[in-house]
Amino acid sequence: MTSNELKEIMRKQGRADALDLAARAPQMDGTAIIAEEEKIPAWSENAVYTSKQVGYPVQDNGQVYTIQMPHTPAHNPGSRPADLRAIYSLLHTTDPAKAKPWMPSYGTSGLYKLNEVCTYPNAQGVEHVWRNLWNDNEFPPLTLNVESRWEDLGEAAAYGL
């Protein structure tokens, strides 16, 4: 088998894995989707996301999102999923080893549910993993007067992040 044939087999398997996850994603939560992150395709500015792809996951800049409505990213040049949160819903996980950097919510997109985790620098500037203790939390760890909404799980490096 040539290297080109092997690449083609791997490409087909990757596509099949991505389509399988996409079909299951609407019934899955962020933790389950992010657990299969290696199957999630990268967001593309050149894509055309149709109504058939609503609910499909995409990843961009280290975050995972689901597509909320049909659209063509090229119509918003220079914008990425983090900028278009009415179109892309930010997902979170409860798995500390898969924690993503904290991002602000946009409406209900990206609110942290109970036990979801993120990475965020501690008071000394060292990246830590934090578990959310408050449902629908929009505040980052260490925010004045809401510190009790987060539990520090330790350095992110201890989780391989």
For the regions a language model picked out, list residue spans one by one.
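Tryptophan-rich substrate-binding surfaces of secreted polymer-degrading and adhesive proteins
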Residues: 2-161
